[in-house]
């Protein structure tokens, strides 16, 4: 099966990057660094590392806070409540997200892989 580790730090004010997101898996690693908008990909197959600066739309920059994520999430929620758009994140999605956290805790404590099936999913 697939494996990955995600590390998100959004409170790194006293560092080079205010927000850092990285995911590591069997194929390599990807890092996203803000506010520099740098995406770096490293492949295990050839040990090549490639970085690029990603251009962010002005609308997203203007939205602020977490590069607009909070603004756009709240906007989508309001549209769904009004019946103007479909629900993007369901209660089932939330249930699965909590289960992933529980699985991670069990995995760390017991030094083993944990399946979603063990948690009733």
Positions of PLM-derived features:
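Residue-level detector of alpha-helix boundaries and kinks
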Residues: 8, 62-63, 79, 89
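Short glycine/proline-rich turn/loop motifs
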Residues: 54-60, 85
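Mobile, glycine-enriched helix-loop/loop "lid" segments at the mouths of ligand-binding/catalytic clefts
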Residues: 31, 36-55
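Generic secondary-structure boundary/loop-capping signal
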Residues: 27, 44, 113-116
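Contiguous beta-strand/loop segments that form the cofactor/metal-binding neighborhood of enzyme cores
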Residues: 1-37, 68-84, 102, 120-121
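A short glycine-threonine-serine/GTX helix/turn-capping micro-motif
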Residues: 60-68
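C-terminal helix-rich "cap/oligomerization" subdomain common to oxidoreductases
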Residues: 76-121
């Amino acid at each position: 099966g697939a494996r990955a580790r995600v590390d998100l730090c959004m409170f790194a004010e006293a560092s080079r990057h205010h927000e850092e997101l990285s995911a590591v898996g069997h194929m390599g690693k990807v890092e996203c660094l803000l506010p520099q908008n740098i995406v770096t990909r490293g492949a295990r197959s050839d040990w090549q590392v490639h970085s690029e600066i990603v251009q962010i739309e002005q609308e997203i920059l203007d939205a602020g806070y977490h590069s607009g994520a909070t603004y756009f999430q709240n906007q989508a929620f309001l549209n769904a409540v009004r019946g103007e758009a479909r629900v993007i994140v369901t209660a089932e999605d939330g249930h699965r997200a909590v289960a992933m956290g529980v699985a991670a805790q069990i995995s760390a404590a017991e030094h083993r892989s944990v399946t979603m099936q063990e948690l009733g999913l």
